[in-house]
């Protein structure tokens, strides 16, 4: 390998001109040097943009992104092309694309030499056009006189087309932090929900021993296909009418293409109506082949109407194909049902075209957007095309021509046909309580689109994140939509070998991009590469486009946003995760996808967990209470428009962002959330202050009670002291009180004059005594005061004798003052007997 130069070997002039190129990114400022080093220094190993297990394998300096005329460095990793801007050293999203997301790539030479490079020997004459499956057409310009382009093309040929499915990056990266759980368990849990058995949870033991065959009054789950012997493209568990035996199911499978017999995809929890799916019946060229078991199975969908005794519901058999295509399939043994053979049935043809028409339409739409966008792959602005300056680039005739090209692509017409068919199916189920059987040819493309969209309209659960995952895994993955064929990945054959899709020349496949090639030009004769174009078709992308149209009509009905759908399809096309590898559940089980690859659902959930409901994947207008039932859009509202978040993100990246309203609403939601948190914090502080105030009030009340009790106790003590004082006075005692609580009582012998000295104010000195002296003047006075021997008339009973109570009591009494605190003395103690 040559012409791949390590970063350390760049010329000084290129590094010095980086500041100048930041604003222009022009070819004029590049100094072209020949790259003669084939080694790579590994200087990009610490790039922040690299994913887990992603490593750089090649580097090409001085590459120009023709779409935006921006200079930079093109890197090739084991997963994708990366384009780093020379000025900012950041990834340029337009020039960064995973290998398997590339539909084709061509070597090109410019048709007309621009005046800008007319006399420049370093003009961009080595061009590589890369056409993506995500609507982008990118052109890289390489240095003349080098083998940069040759080396990049050679690397793309090897990395873009892995020989085996496990050579994909999904296996290199492994499950990592986005580990997968068993998808079979999730399918059974969804079946349980439909049967009204949500309390049951699936487990591996249940799957291994086959004990998942639950049922309700009308429907049951069968394990007849647990080993994929009944139908290799169907899931291991099927939901069928309870009245049909497994033997009858086996007989029915032989009458349907690829053994895809009619089974239930969704059932109404109230009315009992169902949406069933299958492939076309094998009625033959003369439309005269019949199957009693098939007719019985289909008739079992016409259960009795609730509230109508004996009346059975109507059955609509919806053939997604145009009638002429259904008749043409009769030559191959296929065809369509006859209403005369199926009980209470009506056959309806929706006229939706096949995968080849969708592929061509998608290609024409991509070319239209590249031609009339602001980042055309030929480097010319649409405003300057045809020499004009008006809208669309040119005069009135070019304006009308551009509108005509959009209409001629047919993409929006196909979207409208699908939406009209889905709305019709949903209305029959919701308004008539009718059952609907949907099929096309094989029953895995148009059938899957119609059935899953009808479920989305009828069941609000599928309009949530978890419900959307359940819907995709049930109707797209489990029922065998061939993702490997439709997306363009290595296939797994029945024998276990790996095969690559047949290459097809880009000149025969799609109309050319705006770098217009003419017969005989260098571009037309250059090499090209494409990936499985025979079976490639954007069926799943078209389904997501239909959902975006419904989200535009019902902006409050979906929990997820259009940005979520864009990131979802990007993850799918990149094959970074293993969920959508292979063509069927059986093949994914054989390859051990769930154990060895990362899970797209875990990755998307991890993105949302960082920001909660303010994440760009969350719809800020979501109101589940407003749309808690079926969505039945009228026919007049089914006029589709371009999906701006997906269709215009590469063609018109600098135009006004169509999600500005969502972004503003999301910012307001974040601000509201912050203010709500601040309010909650303020309320918490108010509650704390209120609690503190209540606590203080309680303490104040307690203090008040204590103070009241103390005052009452003091009053009682004062009263007791007064009583004691009177008692002591009656005894003619001299009492001496001290602050330490001691009290000395002395009783004098002779009658003395009674005197009562009130103690002075206590001094601050703790040793100051408080004394009280009491003496009697006469015995008569004492007797008159307190003697209990006085008669009622006031005379002493023994007037001639000396008072025996004076002089002989409390002699030498020494007491502790604290004893008085515990002494309760009442006036009644001293009343006369």
From Swiss-Prot:
Residues 660-717 form a coiled coil. Residues 504-530 have a biased composition (Low complexity). Its EC number is 3.1.3.95, 3.1.3.64. CDD domains: PTP-MTM-like. The keyword Cytoplasm applies. InterPro entries: GRAM (IPR004182), Myotubularin (IPR030564), Myotubularin-like_Pase_dom (IPR010569), PH-like_dom_sf (IPR011993), Prot-tyrosine_phosphatase-like (IPR029021), Tyr_Pase_AS (IPR016130). Disulfide bonds: none annotated. Its main location: cytoplasm. Mostly expressed in flowers and roots, and, to a lower extent, in siliques and leaves. Residues 181-647 form the Myotubularin phosphatase domain. Keywords: Coiled coil, Cytoplasm, Hydrolase, Lipid metabolism, Protein phosphatase. It catalyses: a 1,2-diacyl-sn-glycero-3-phospho-(1D-myo-inositol-3-phosphate) + H2O = a 1,2-diacyl-sn-glycero-3-phospho-(1D-myo-inositol) + phosphate; a 1,2-diacyl-sn-glycero-3-phospho-(1D-myo-inositol-3,5-bisphosphate) + H2O = a 1,2-diacyl-sn-glycero-3-phospho-(1D-myo-inositol-5-phosphate) + phosphate. GO terms for cellular component: cytoplasm. Pfam families: Myotub-related. GO terms for biological process: intracellular signal transduction; lipid metabolic process. Residues 42-109 form the GRAM domain. Phosphatase with phosphoinositide 3'-phosphatase activity that can use phosphatidylinositol-3-phosphate (PtdIns3P) and phosphatidylinositol-3,5-diphosphate (PtdIns3,5P(2)) as substrates and produces phosphatidylinositol-5-phosphate (PtdIns5P); participates in pathway(s) that transfer gene regulatory signals to the nucleus. Belongs to the protein-tyrosine phosphatase family. Non-receptor class myotubularin subfamily. This is Phosphatidylinositol-3-phosphatase myotubularin-2. It comes from Arabidopsis thaliana. The lineage of its organism: Eukaryota, Viridiplantae, Streptophyta, Embryophyta, Tracheophyta.
């Amino acid at each position: 390998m040559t012409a791949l130069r390590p970063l350390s070997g760049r010329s000084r002039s290129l590094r010095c001109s980086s500041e100048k190129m930041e604003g222009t990114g022009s070819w004029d400022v590049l100094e072209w040097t020949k790259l003669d080093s084939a080694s790579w220094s590994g200087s990009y190993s610490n790039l922040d943009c690299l994913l887990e297990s992603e490593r750089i394998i090649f580097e090409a300096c001085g590459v120009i992104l023709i779409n935006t005329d921006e200079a930079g460095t093109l890197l090739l990793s084991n997963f994708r092309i990366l384009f780093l801007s020379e000025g900012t050293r950041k990834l340029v999203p337009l020039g960064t694309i995973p290998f398997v997301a590339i539909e084709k790539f061509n070597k090109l030479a410019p048709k007309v030499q621009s005046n800008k490079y007319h006399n420049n020997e370093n003009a961009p004459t080595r061009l590589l056009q890369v056409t993506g499956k995500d609507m982008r057409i990118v052109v890289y310009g390489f240095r003349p006189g080098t083998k940069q382009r040759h080396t990049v093309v050679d690397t793309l040929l090897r990395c873009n087309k892995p020989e085996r499915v496990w050579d994909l990056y999904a296996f290199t990266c492994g499950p990592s932090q986005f580990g997968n759980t068993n998808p079979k368990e999730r399918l059974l849990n969804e079946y349980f929900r439909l049967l009204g058995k949500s309390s049951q949870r699936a487990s591996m033991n249940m799957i291994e021993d086959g004990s998942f065959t639950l049922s309700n009054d009308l429907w049951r789950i069968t394990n007849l296909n647990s080993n994929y012997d009944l139908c290799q493209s169907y899931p291991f568990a099927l939901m069928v009418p309870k009245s049909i035996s497994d033997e009858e199911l086996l007989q029915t499978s032989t009458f349907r293409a690829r053994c895809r017999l009619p089974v239930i995809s969704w059932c109404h929890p109230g009315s009992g109506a169902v949406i069933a799916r299958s492939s076309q019946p094998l009625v033959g060229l003369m439309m005269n082949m019949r199957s009693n078991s098939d007719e019985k199975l289909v008739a079992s969908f016409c259960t009795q109407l609730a509230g109508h005794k004996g009346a059975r519901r109507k059955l609509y058999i919806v053939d997604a194909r145009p009638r002429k295509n259904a008749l043409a399939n009769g030559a191959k043994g296929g065809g369509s049902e006859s209403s005369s053979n199926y009980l209470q049935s009506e056959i309806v043809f929706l006229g939706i075209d096949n995968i080849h028409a969708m592929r061509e339409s998608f290609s024409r739409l991509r070319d239209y957007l590249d031609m009339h966008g602001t980042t055309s792959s030929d480097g010319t602005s649409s405003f300057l095309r045809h020499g004009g300056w008006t809208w669309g680039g040119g005069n009135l005739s070019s304006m009308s021509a551009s509108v005509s090209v959009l209409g001629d692509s047919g993409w929006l017409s196909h979207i409208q046909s699908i939406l009209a068919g889905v709305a019709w199916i949903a209305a029959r189920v919701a308004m008539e309580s009718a059952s609907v059987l949907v099929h096309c040819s094989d029953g895995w493309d148009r059938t899957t689109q119609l059935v899953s969209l009808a479920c989305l309209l009828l069941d609000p659960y599928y309009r949530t994140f978890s419900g959307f995952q359940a819907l995709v895994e049930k109707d797209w993955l489990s029922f065998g939509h061939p993702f490997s064929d439709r997306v363009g990945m290595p296939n797994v054959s029945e024998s276990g070998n790996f095969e690559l899709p047949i290459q097809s020349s880009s000149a025969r496949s799609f109309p050319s991009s705006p770098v217009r090639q003419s017969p005989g030009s260098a571009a037309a004769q250059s090499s090209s590469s494409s990936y499985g174009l025979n079976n490639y078709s954007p069926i799943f992308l078209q389904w997501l486009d239909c959902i975006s149209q419904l989200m535009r009509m019902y902006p409050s009905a979906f929990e997820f946003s259009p940005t979520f759908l864009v990131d979802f399809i990007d993850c799918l096309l990149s094959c970074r995760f293993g969920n959508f590898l292979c063509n069927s559940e059986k093949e994914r089980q054989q390859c051990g996808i769930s154990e060895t690859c990362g899970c797209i659902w875990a990755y998307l959930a991890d993105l949302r967990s960082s920001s909660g409901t303010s994440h760009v994947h969350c719809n800020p207008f979501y109101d589940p209470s407003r749309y808690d039932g079926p969505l039945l859009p009228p026919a007049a509202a089914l006029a589709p428009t371009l999906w701006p978040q997906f269709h215009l993100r590469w063609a018109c990246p600098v135009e006004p962002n169509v999600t500005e309203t969502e972004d503003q609403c999301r910012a307001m939601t974040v601000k509201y959330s912050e203010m709500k948190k601040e309010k909650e914090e303020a309320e918490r502080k108010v509650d704390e202050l209120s609690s503190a105030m209540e606590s203080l009030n309680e303490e104040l009340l307690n203090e008040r009670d204590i103070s009241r009790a103390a005052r009452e106790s003091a009053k009682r003590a004062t009263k007791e002291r007064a009583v004691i004082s009177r008692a002591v006075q009656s005894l003619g005692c001299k009492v001496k009180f001290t602050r330490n609580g001691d009290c000395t009582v002395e009783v004098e012998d002779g009658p003395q004059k009674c005197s009562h000295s009130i103690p002075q104010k206590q001094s601050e000195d703790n040793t100051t005594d408080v004394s009280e002296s009491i003496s009697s003047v006469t015995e008569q006075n004492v007797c008159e005061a307190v003697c209990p021997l006085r008669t009622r008339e006031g005379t002493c009973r023994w007037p001639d004798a000396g008072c025996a109570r004076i002089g002989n009591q409390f002699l030498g009494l020494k007491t502790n003052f604290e004893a008085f605190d515990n002494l309760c003395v009442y006036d009644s103690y001293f009343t006369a007997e």
